[in-house]
């Protein structure tokens, strides 16, 4: 069975495949029913409204919002520097809360690549001729992910990638997997689909069609890209060197180049944050790093744990 979206895209969901169990067919159909309405929702308008609501400092509103999210998602405030939910000035202050230093110990392996965030691995693996695996036979392109810049994407053509999804319960600050010096930042306009498993399974080119901010660093492993992907209700994306990058959204790709006084960030240092949750994609070049072979899609990961190591016979192109 094919589904024709209002955008003109056709999706093959085949819920009646003879080899599928009733449960898997129902799951597939449910995922499409969740995803399709998002094509007609005013995604940016809803996200702008959330931007305002999340910063509202009315005590009754923000306390009710914080307590509801804490209860529904099981947020562990004992890890936070400020464990009292009512002490936060706004919902956004709660959502981007700092953790106690001991809450996320870093791997002590000097060659370790640290996990940049709390979350779940959506996918992890190799980039094949510039193509990254999304889910269920769907792929997206590194060049499109980085705003259509072929030169920017070239070093990652046959490299490694890891896609990590942050849920509403997670810590929403993002940290450096390895020390690096910022070379370029790119803000790519786009849509704002949800980025959970249902949309990853059903929306083509999801991560390369949503609004995103990509930061390119020079590291001892060669070029590294950290791509912060927006989603519906992700009210803003910010970095420590620029502040809030979005909103406002932009009509065209916008690029910042850094040279002489470029920011340098240490391994484990905060580099940015999501004001509401979404996804971070980490890219490295060919023969630069090796992921931990035990990690796979669906695994829960924590900030500071080892995602992989510098490759033993490291070679890379800049």
Residue ranges, per PLM feature:
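Contiguous, well-folded functional domains in the mature portion of proteins
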Residues: 3, 11-318
């Amino acid at each position: 069975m094919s589904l024709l979206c209002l955008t003109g895209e056709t999706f093959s969901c085949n819920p009646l495949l003879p080899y599928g169990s009733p449960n898997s067919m129902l799951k597939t159909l449910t995922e499409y029913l969740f995803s399709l309405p998002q094509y007609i929702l005013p995604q940016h308008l809803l996200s702008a409204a959330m931007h305002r609501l999340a910063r509202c400092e009315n005590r009754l509103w923000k306390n009710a919002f914080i307590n509801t999210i804490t209860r529904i998602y099981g947020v562990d405030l004992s890890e936070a520097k400020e464990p009292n939910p009512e002490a936060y000035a706004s919902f956004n202050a709660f959502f981007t809360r700092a953790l106690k230093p001991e809450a996320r110990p870093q791997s002590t392996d000097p060659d370790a690549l640290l996990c940049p965030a709390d979350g779940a691995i959506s996918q992890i693996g190799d980039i094949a001729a510039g193509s990254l695996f999304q889910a269920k036979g769907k792929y997206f392109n590194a060049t499109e992910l980085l705003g259509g810049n072929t030169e920017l994407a070239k070093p990652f053509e046959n490299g490694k990638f890891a896609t990590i999804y942050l849920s509403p319960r997670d810590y929403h600050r993002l940290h450096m997997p390895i020390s690096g010096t910022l070379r370029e930042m790119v803000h790519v306009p786009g849509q704002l689909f949800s980025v959970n498993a249902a949309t990853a399974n059903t929306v083509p080119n999801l991560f390369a069609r949503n609004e995103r901010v990509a930061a390119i660093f020079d590291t001892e492993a060669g070029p590294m890209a950290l791509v912060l992907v927006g989603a519906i209700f992700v009210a803003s994306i910010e970095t420590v060197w620029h502040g809030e990058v979005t909103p406002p959204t932009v009509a065209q790709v916008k690029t910042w180049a850094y040279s002489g006084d470029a920011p340098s960030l240490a391994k484990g240092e905060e580099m940015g944050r999501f004001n509401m949750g979404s996804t971070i994609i980490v890219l490295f070049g060919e023969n630069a790093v090796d992921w931990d072979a035990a990690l796979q899609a669906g695994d829960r990961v924590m900030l500071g744990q080892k995602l992989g190591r510098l490759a033993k016979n490291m070679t890379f192109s800049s």
